[in-house]
Amino acid sequence: GQALYEQVVGKDKMNQPCRIYAPVGSHEDLLAYLVRRLLENGANTSFVNRLADDEAPIADIIADPVTEIEKLEQIPHPHIPLPSAIFAGRVNSQGAALWDDATRAGLMSGIENALAKPFEAHALIDGKPDLVGPLRRITSPHDRRMEIGQVWEADEKAVARAMESAAKAQMDWDLSGGTSRAAMLDKAAGLFEANTERFAALLVREAGKSLDNAIADLREAVDFLRYYAMQARAEFNGPMLLPGPTGERNELSLHGRGVFACISPWNFPLAIFTGQMAAALASGNSVVSKPAEQTPLIAFEAVRLMHEAGVPKSVLQLVPGDGARIGKVLLAHPALSGVAFTGSNETASIINRALAARDGAIPTLIAETGGMNAMIVDSSALPEQAVRDVLASAFDSAGQRCSAARLLFVQDDVAGRVIGMLKGAMAELKVGDPMEFATDVGPVIDEDARAGLEAHKARMRAEEKTIINLPLGADCSHGTFVAPAAFELSSIAALKREVFGPVLHVVRFAGDRVGDVCDALNATGYGLTLGLHTRIESTAAEVRRRVRVGNMYVNRNQIGAVVGAQPFGGEGLSGTGPKAGGPHYLHRFATERVCSTDTTASGGNAALMSL
């Protein structure tokens, strides 16, 4: 670089100003940086390296790399798929470059247009509006003075009619075949993406999601539709021939079980709501969907588009309203064949007991519940990377993810540094309106959630050590906001239950006791997600072997499972399985039938004559 500097700086040269910089810091901070720069500048293709090569033509050295790439006949590598084609058999969902001002401005303009008119939702019984039930205003969690729409909740009679109609329609839907059903799901995926701004508006204002979380929620819904459509074509499109002796033909086919009640949560009001009904529909079931009380507007828009995509209105019914009241009718109805549920462990247990107490066939229960999710950071981990991933895992979506980290186990040797770095990083989190791109943490869903979290924080302040508890600004005074907080616990026993919000609990552990950490996590009975930061392969192998957990993430955050790539679901108190977005999920919605035919009765096996 010195030779280049001498050619550029000075009045008798090119008279161009140059900046000289000298990184300052400790050995542990700067060594990695120095090695990286040495590797970059020492590479054969490096500008600095080639500049010192007397045999290298100047024209080659100063050539514009963009111009050189444009000369290539084929810029993409033929064996590296483009983002839209990374998943074989289906199109990837569309993302949005929110960091780009023009892209973000276009999205915001569409959101403003969508919010210009209040939204409405109501029960859809055979596609017809049911306006008999109670009317309720829907306000935004970031500002309860902002009314964004209203919902007519279904009454008990409407729920019963929905179940009866869905039962009558199910057989024809099952007989329509996987290819026909898949075409409708694929069409629905396209309609969802065509309504990105409308969904984003609702996800931000009704559910309190940030802009990037809103886009991610929509993308996951689209991925569910296309993934289950792909599976329906492959596995629900006719019988599979099984092996057997000559003179006999054995076939196995998959069929819908009947009517599925799909009961979804508010934290992923589009993705999980869509995933449940898409899986049930793809498998040949009819569906009665019951969305969370907090997010009926999003559910209504989704069902409306599913009907527009061709799903028969009698096959897909919508019954928004109070969970206990509607759930009682759904679970007791004789037409019920299965329940897909995502929510609390307590509610899942109530559903399970209600199903077991029924007379007749016991409906199938597919439940995904919560978890005492932890991240383990040992002394070999990169502190900056670990803290970055802890922030995302614990505080993204205001900690309102099933997969969010509730516990951070950090090794004694590095605990002081990691906790100090975490405290500093948390101090920079911006809490506020989720519509603002700079916001890191938005509101929690409602006043009940806020009150419960504040009560827990008060107990932690009284009984444990406070690391940091962020203040809330005046702009948060009209919403249900909870300031992010971190507490250091004396042991995991101090955490009695899952805390569903932006609160992190830190526990130190000795370097030779990682096995004890695994045992403590298993002892909770939960098994949803686990994060691990280590550069020691044997540690990763031991933790993977010992911890009973559905989804484990190594040296990354533990949120944002991708459909088809990271099937999601837990074990133990965290759910029944199988995993949503995985190859075995649809099978749980289906029943198997085998037909064995004696071919000798019609003349034997003619295929033998052509051997």
Task: Say what each PLM segment does.
Residues 1-10, 16, 412-413, 418-419:
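Long hydrophobic segments that form regular secondary structure
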Residues 17-24, 30, 35-58, 141-151, ...:
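Conserved C-terminal structural/oligomerization subdomain of aldehyde/semialdehyde dehydrogenase
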Residues 39, 44, 49-150, 168:
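Hydrophobic face of amphipathic alpha-helices that form TPR/SEL1-like repeat modules
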Residues 132-139, 144-236:
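Glycine-rich loop-to-alpha-helix module at the N-terminal edge of alpha/beta enzyme cores
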Residues 145, 166, 181, 203, ...:
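Residue-level signal for inorganic ion chemistry
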Residues 204, 234-387, 577:
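Rossmann-like NAD(P) dinucleotide-binding subdomain of oxidoreductase/dehydrogenase enzymes
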Residues 286-288, 467, 551:
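A short hydrophobic/small-residue beta-strand
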Residues 305-311, 332-333, 338, 346-490, ...:
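ALDH superfamily catalytic-core signature
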